[in-house]
A protein has these predicted regions:
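Conserved catalytic core of the tyrosine transesterase superfamily
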Residues: 1-188
């Protein structure tokens, strides 16, 4: 199985902070990177987001997903930081309805968002193999580490089965393994 790259190092974290703050590659890149790293949505799910899918007062987004060949609507909680970024983005883009990501020629497609991601990664000096899917993997691993709740990660990512989530995202780093065995039987 091919290893999915994560955004790990301090340098990469700083570059991502720059991307999220809009200092690199403009308003679409800022929102795309922030949304990807804050929600774990697939690029196709981000491209499909509509203005009406975002509820900033209640702090959630509604996502249309394809599960077992059926479309479903999932509601995902979003954090305070992304809520503020969405407010700023919507105001700067003067959005009132329609797609959340719109370019000069109309709604941005998944491929268009991937091009924005790649250009942003390059401008930030990050490794080019960091795909937009890397953001999905990154949030999954961090959310699992923070909460220890596989079911929450499964729901966030929209997986039909917790086994899928566990097989793909329950990474254990060497550092985690060392921390786990060091002092295992020490008196507490």
């Amino acid at each position: 199985m091919k290893e999915v790259k994560q955004l790990r190092t301090v340098t990469e974290a700083r570059a991502i902070t720059d991307l999220k703050a809009g200092r690199i590659n403009g308003v679409h890149a800022w929102m795309l990177v922030d949304l990807a790293l804050s929600t774990g949505l697939r690029v196709s799910e981000i491209a499909a987001l509509q203005f009406k899918d975002v509820d900033l007062k209640r702090g959630y987004i509604s996502v249309t997903r394809l599960k077992r060949k059926k479309k479903t609507k999932d509601t995902l909680a979003i954090g305070k930081d992304i809520i503020q970024h969405l407010k700023d983005y919507i105001a700067s883009m003067e959005l009132k309805r329609g797609p959340l990501f719109v370019g000069s020629r109309g709604p941005l497609t998944a491929q268009g968002l991937q091009r924005i991601w790649k250009r942003s990664i390059k401008l930030a000096g990050l490794p080019k193999e960091l795909s937009i899917h890397s953001a999905r993997h990154t949030i999954a691993v961090h959310l699992l580490k923070k909460t220890g709740n596989l079911r929450q990660v499964q729901k966030q990512l929209g997986h039909a089965s917790p086994a899928t989530t566990a097989n793909m995202y329950a990474d254990i780093s060497f550092e985690d393994m060392q921390n786990g065995v060091n002092g295992l039987y020490d008196q507490q």
